[in-house]
Structure formats: C-alpha cells, structure tokens
Amino acid sequence: MTPPPPPPPPPGPDPAADPAADPCPWPGSLVVLFGATAGALGRDLGSDETDLILLVWQVVEPRSRQVGTLHKSLVRAEAAALSTQCREASGLSADSLARAEPLDKVLQQFSQLVNGDVALLGGGPYMLCTDGQQLLRQVLHPEASRKNLVLPDMFFSFYDLRREFHMQHPSTCPARDLTVATMAQGLGLETDATEDDFGVWEVKTMVAVILHLLKEPSSQLFSKPEVIKQKYETGPCSDSTVPCPYSSKADVVDSETVVRARGLPWQSSDQDVARFFKGLNVARGGVALCLNAQGRRNGEALIRFVDSEQRDLALQRHKHHMGVRYIEVYKATGEEFVKIAGGTSLEVARFLSREDQVILRLRGLPFSAGPTDVLGFLGPECPVTGGTEGLLFVRHPDGRPTGDAFALFACEELAQAALRRHKGMLGKRYIELFRSTAAEVQQVLNRYASGPLLPTLTAPLLPIPFPLAPGTGRDCVRLRGLPYTATIEDILSFLGEAAADIRPHGVHMVLNQQGRPSGDAFIQMTSAERALAAAQRCHKKVMKERYVEVVPCSTEEMSRVLMGGTLGRSGMSPPPCKLPCLSPPTYTTFQATPTLIPTETAALYPSSALLPAARVPAAPTPVAYYPGPATQLYLNYTAYYPSPPVSPTTVGYLTTPTAALASAPTSVLSQSGALVRMQGVPYTAGMKDLLSVFQAYQLPADDYTSLMPVGDPPRTVLQAPKEWVCL
C-alpha cells in the first residue's frame, strides 16, 4: 500500500501584501506622463488658458523594474501662436503643430499604446504619474471640457511625483517648489545632459527618480493616489470629514479653501460654475450663487474647495473664460461663504436632506397657489420628488406668501422637462423657472426670515439749519467749479481781501446725495455791493488748476439750492419738498430743567420729542441751531463758520454764537405745534387727502397769526395747513 503524500508546506507571506518586502503597495504599472501647452510652462502651466501641444509618456513596472517604450506625440492647437517661452524651450513651430492630430485623436492613440505597453510588461492595472498636478487639473480637464470631450477613467486618478518624493524626503523644499531637476539632484542621480528633445529628458529623469524611490523601503510610497471628481455633487454643503445634514451658520469654514468668482452670466447655474473649475475638487454643495437686494443673482459666486491646494490652483484661473465672458477669481473668507450658504431653518434642512437632487426655483406664483396647483402646473411628465414634500414655499415672517418656491427633481432629464414650462401660465400669471442651488435656497429663506428687503427706517433726526435772513438783495455769491478737495481755508485764500466782508456763518458748502462736496458753495457777504465786487474780482480765478466761476445771487436763490432745489442758467427750480417758504424755518428754544440725554437717544428721535412737556417761551428769544454734522443727516449742505471759528459736535440744542443774533430775524416760529410723520401713505394720496385726516384738529383762524413768521401774507384756514405738509 502506497503511503499518502506528505501535506504541502504552509503558504509563505505574499510579497504583494508585505510592505517590508515590497516598497510599492500599488499592484499595477505606472504611466509617467509629461505635457506642455503653447503658453506658460512649469508652475504656471495652464494659467494662461492655452491649448495642449505635447504629450510624452513611458510605462514603468515597479516590481520588475522594467520600462516600456518612450512615446512622444504632438497635439494640434486651435491657436497656432506659441509663446516665446514655449518656442525657446521646445523648439517647436506653428507649422509642425499644424500637421499634428487633434486632441481627441491623440487621446485615442495614447490609450491604445499604453494598453499595449502594459500588456508587454505583464498586464494588470495602471495609473498615471505626473510631475505636479497642473497637467491634469489645469490643462487636460479644462480643455476637454471646453471641447466637449469625454476623458477615459484613467485621467481621474494619478500619482503626484512631487508629493511622493516629499513624503520620502520631507527635509527638502515644499512639494509645490520641487522640479524634476531638483528631485534628481536631491537623490544624486546622473542625468543625460546631452538630451535636447523637449519632454524626453523630463520623462527619462522622472523614471529614474521613481526607480530610485522604489529601492527605499516604505509602506507609504504610491499608496494614496490623487483623485479628480468626475462630477459636482449638489446638495447642502458639509465638511468633507464630518458630514452634517445641512450647512449651519455655526459651521466654521477654512478661509484657505474659498474663492469668489465675479462676472458670471446671470443665467449660469452651480453646474456651470463647477464646469468652469473642471479638474478641481469642489466641495459638496460648495457653489454658492450670490443674490442682490432684490433676491436676484448678481453675477458673483463663492466656491469652496476640498483643500487649500485646490484653492491655489483655482486662483490661477483668474480671467479665464466662460463662453465669451472672462471670470475674475479672488480670495474670499470662510465667514463670507457661511453667510451666503449657511442656514438655521429646520424646514430647509429637511428639504435639502435628499441627496443627488436637482433644484429648480419657481418665481411669480399667485399668492393663493398651493402645492396641488404647483404640481398640476408642472404636470405628470416631470414629477416632483416626494410630491408635495419636494416643494418648499418661501413666506414672509408673518406667513404671507412671496410668490417664490423651490422644487426637487430626481434627475437631470426631469429638471429639463420642467424647465420647458418656463413662462407657462398658472391662472393669470406666467411662472418663471430657473436652476437653483442649496445655497440659493438658504439665501432666499434667510433673506425673508430676517425681515423685509427694504426695512423701515427709524425716524431721522430733523435738524434745524442756521436761519438765513430774509431779503431779495443780491448780497450773496455762488462759487461753481470748486475742486472736490477744496476746504474752507482754500476758499478764504481764493477770495483774498473779499474774505473780510463775509458775514458770520456765511460760507455754505453744497453736498451731493452721497454727502460729498459737489463743487458748489454759497457765501453771504455784508452787502450787495461787496458781493458784486467779489464776483468781479474773483470770477474765473484758478484754484488748484481749476478755474472757479463766481456770480452774485440772492439769499432766496441760495436758500432754494441749500434746501434741495437747483439753480441753473435757465432759472430756479423749487426743492423736492415743494415748501413755499423761501428760507429754512427757524425755531425758538425753551428754558427747562437741565436734562442729560444720551447721544444715541438724541440721534434716533426728533429733538421736539426730547423736550420737556412744559414749554414756556423765554425772553429774549434766542435762536436755536444744529451743528454741521447734524445738518448733513437731513439737508444737502454744510454750513461753515469762518468768523469766529466754531465747530460744535454735541447733538442737540446749543448756545447760539452772539454774532449770529444780529442776522437772525426779529420774529421766529414758535414751538407751540408738533411735527407728525405719516408712514404707509398710498402713492395716489394728494394734499386734500392728507388734510382731511387732520380735519378735526385744525386751529381757529385767529390762532394762525402767532404761528406765521413776520412778513408772510395773510392766509385762510384752508391755506395755512397746506404749507406744513411735505410729500
């Protein structure tokens, strides 16, 4: 009987599974790839948006240390012009590139040759290895996107030789500063200095560096490939390491991962923005389209990337093109991104919790429209995900509808079918449909939840300008064409000897709507003769390389301009408030118990509301006035006081300079009335409508005498209130 054979020996350790025995965990081949464009080279490769013109590659088998055939292929570029740097480094010409194959043909040849070389070296999987990330992320993927080419799967993962080298030799310079020459020099490799074929020397040197690194024992070498996302992931933005159901305003976003894109077409979507940054890894839901005050897109977007290296590459796409428009790319902060994309509503969180959904925005819905109406409008051919659960209506804080809504669709085809309903009729209104994003949903909901787009302002401080003495004599001069930087000292120097004839508080600078100097000024002189002499002496004199017109005018004309009217060569137009009085009214102050009023309180309420209840006119009657800073809040001019120099800053009633009392009117309007502000008045309301509201509160005709300044003609009961109404 034959004895049974001895049992087989136990299997030994697999060399592929033992890191100490095999320094390369990657089980396949490496395809060393080098490329160049018609523009910038090196670290700036792809920053000028030029086309690819050259590909050089060679296959390396890490375990057997075998290498395949070196291949070189030219690529025809749409723009035949070569930069000086490229022409000197490569030695190529426009004629040689014109005879080359286009990019799609070259990529087909590349795949066929790589598969053949890998099969000769033993077969198995393979992965690209490049010098840096610019070739794939900044050149190949953006160009393929512009030309609508579909890249094979091999171009979506690769090894960065710089990063692998820096992992083995961290004491060298940062990975982004490494080059093929510095890596070879750091390893002490001898390179072929006689090789002058552009791209061939780089590939041969990269292969030598890889083979030298494989001799060093390491379990990390070629273990973590770089991955390029094939598509942009929509949905609520979340941290790539700590997923969350939705983006919250409490989230902290690294500012080194955010950029701002400006100049986007208004109809562009988040997918269009992600396509502009093709080749870079945008974080999930990382495209936040910005809206203006009216809730419409303003052509800007904030984009969040997965790391700072992707952000630095995105900044190199500054002024690259989206269609025919160039897009500006700047740095942004994480706080700005959270402000746009973050939210706090649980309703929005539940709405955005569904992944891989296409969001559309519906605008212009009837206020009475409900979920059933919207679903009927879209029709059965484009069903909403979850039915009524896939609709989100935007409402005011009090629950009133805004006419906006968002809808979720399961795929791009259903969204395209829904977009064909753009400007379709629902009832008597046409509905607009747009692509939207999770960040836009957050923005719109946050905007309406935080209050109206145009909030109601608090009652402003109503300043009382310095009183202007009535009169029709032309005792004032108008300076036109002043430099915007002109100061009161410049005006006094410009007038020269005539500055001695200026009245106290007699220089008035006219400001524009933004509170900046308009180039005009009015000066009150002591008499009409002095004003005429100053105009004749100073007309068209030069101040800071500009000639200034000096013309005489009356106090009435000056008052109209300072209160908002205009004075031109064709005549004088009244101010917007249509007040019949020719000069700002003046008011009396009243003696009362001294009271300390906080500055914040005085800045929010009219001064009449801060006065004590008991108001007894004092004698003699002083003139009350507001300082310049308070005047700027309401009127379009600033009064300066050259003699004596006074610059009060306290808000409220101040003691009037003694010199001002001489020019004040002898009788002023008493404070026996009250000022009423009406909000919510219909646009069609007229003067009679407003007077009818206060019909029961009119004063007897005899009481108007004490309320009118001296010199006003007698007025009837129906005429008097009209002049105190400002529309």
UniProtKB/Swiss-Prot annotation:
Protein's GO biological process: alternative mRNA splicing, via spliceosome; branching involved in salivary gland morphogenesis; epithelial cell proliferation; epithelial tube branching involved in lung morphogenesis; positive regulation of epithelial cell proliferation; regulation of RNA splicing
CC annotations in GO: nucleoplasm; nucleus; ribonucleoprotein complex
Entry's Gene Ontology molecular function annotations: mRNA binding; RNA binding
Ranges for region Disordered: 1-22
Alphabetized UniProt keyword annotations: mRNA processing, mRNA splicing, Nucleus, Phosphoprotein, Repeat, RNA-binding
Alphabetical list of SMART domains matching this protein: RRM
Domain RRM: 257-353, 358-438, 475-555
Swiss-Prot/TrEMBL induction comment: Down-regulated during the epithelial-to-mesenchymal transition (EMT).
Tissue: Epithelial cell-specific.
Localisation: Nucleus
SUPFAM superfamilies according to UniProt: Ribonuclease H-like, RNA-binding domain, RBD
Modified residues (Phosphoserine): S83, S573
CDD domains reported in the protein's UniProt record: RRM3_ESRP1_ESRP2 (cd12742)
Main location group: nucleus
Functional summary from the UniProt entry: mRNA splicing factor that regulates the formation of epithelial cell-specific isoforms. Specifically regulates the expression of FGFR2-IIIb, an epithelial cell-specific isoform of FGFR2. Also regulates the splicing of CD44, CTNND1, ENAH, 3 transcripts that undergo changes in splicing during the epithelial-to-mesenchymal transition (EMT). Acts by directly binding specific sequences in mRNAs. Binds the GU-rich sequence motifs in the ISE/ISS-3, a cis-element regulatory region present in the mRNA of FGFR2.
Subunit annotation: Interacts with RBPMS.
Family the UniProt entry places it in: Belongs to the ESRP family.
Official protein name in the record: Epithelial splicing regulatory protein 2
Gene: ESRP2
